[in-house]
Amino acid sequence: MNLDRDLLLPTSLPLVKICGVRTPADLEACAAAGANAVGLVFAPGSPRELAPTEVIDLIAEMPDELEPIALFVDPANDLVDAWPGAWIQLHGEETPERVTAIAAMTGHRIIKAIPFDADAVLAWDEHPDVEILLIDGPRGGSGEPFDHAALAPLLATLAKPVIIAGGLDPETVAEVVRGLQPFGVDVSSGVESTHGVKDHDRIRAFVTAARG
């Protein structure tokens, strides 16, 4: 696949990202369902963490319809620099200065994940090296939601596109999309049968509900 292209610009919003994919079959299910992007997890200790050989296999099998996004948590320079794709998602406690350094070192385009806090959202919206904000629950990948009603008044004031994560699943995503009209939605545990194992029927149901 071409890893140098831009993040997919969907013909109809929201963009749908399925995070924590681990197998070629997961990729096929995401592409068949109509997802736009997939998240490959490099976070130590996560049930979705990928070994280097698994990453190589997934990149080789990546459908052209999907944009791969690497998810890092406070990464070391060599790890983040080795990612061959265009986009990374920083999901740790990276400071604004660290994000600037990563952007300068790697040239990667950056999605910054933020546990919802109004002041933090406004501050990261002004960061010149962050292109997309991903607003999450208290603990990424846990399925814990945040107060969407508290975010709603902020959205119109933000300059950057916003992806909503945290507690989404096929049963809840449609209401969130109707209420917030975000650029994108992100799901991980909400489309799993067990921790770290994607349920392909739930992936299809999630994409259908998000776009419905």
Label every model-predicted segment.
Residues 1-212:
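Conserved N-terminal beta1-alpha1 strand-loop-helix module at the mouth
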